[in-house]
Design a protein with these regions (language model features):
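Juxtamembrane regions of bacterial inner-membrane/periplasmic proteins
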Residues: 2-232
Length: 232
């Protein structure tokens, strides 16, 4: 009969070592992400997880890919475009601290009723996802994202969060940021975009690889109405 007394401690020790290694790895990765967010307070991100993901997808599938990405100060993005994106993506952006629990509750109720019409992610959550996690979805990623959202709110502040988001968000195939989107779709600088153009651009953000501004008249009208209701 084999002696299992010596095997059990070995297995227990190996499991403990693995768990310890796993915890240390998670803590180190989280700390690195937090440091990147802190650095982003002063340094404009040169790239994001979404940018890298799209490059890899193009390389794997041997498809042509041209990246348009130019980071500009928030002051060079028209107020109309800033307001349109907030109205479309996160109406309570300036009221919450990273999570909009009101929207979470509505989304949960719609899920239960099978009538989901909108997401509950805030601009801060979307920024964290863009910077670190790409477009994939999983409970593990959601948990990691949620742990970094308060850090982003604390170290960056609302205006810097909005500035980075508007500059890195995907606005079409290979098109990142407000300046690139405005130049591509409207042949204009981001500072010169008016209300109608801004609403159409904001309307494509939920599905930037499928939508085009010229086809977003109905949704852009809703965004314009929201802007008016918000005093913009």
């Amino acid at each position: 009969m084999p002696n299992t007394d010596t095997k059990t401690p070995l297995r227990t020790g190996s499991l403990r070592s693995f768990i310890r290694w796993l915890v240390i790895s998670v803590v180190l990765l989280w700390s690195l992400a937090a440091l990147i967010l802190l650095a982003a307070r002063w340094i404009d991100p040169p790239t994001t997880a979404v940018h890298i993901q799209r490059r890899l997808q193009a390389w794997i599938h041997h498809t042509p890919y041209r990246e348009r990405y130019k980071f500009i100060p928030l002051g060079q993005i028209s107020a109309d475009l800033q307001h349109a994106v907030i109205a479309a993506e996160d109406a309570r952006f300036y009221q919450h601290h990273g999570f909009d629990w009101h929207e979470v509750q509505i989304a949960a109720e719609e899920d239960l009723e099978g009538e989901r019409t909108r997401g509950a992610s805030t601009i801060t959550q979307q920024l964290v996802k863009n910077l670190f996690f790409g477009t994939g979805r999983s409970f593990l990623r959601k948990g990691a994202e949620a742990s970094l959202v308060p850090v982003a709110e604390f170290v960056l502040g609302k205006q810097r969060i909005l500035e980075i988001y508007l500059n890195v968000v995907e606005w079409g195939p290979g098109i990142y940021g407000a300046e690139s989107a405005c130049r591509y779709y409207d042949e204009a600088a981001a500072r010169n975009i008016g209300r109608q153009q801004a609403a159409r651009l904001a309307a494509i953000l939920p599905a930037p690889l499928k939508r085009r501004p010229e086809r977003m008249n109905n949704y852009s009208a809703i965004i314009l109405k929201r802007m008016g209701q918000m005093g913009w």
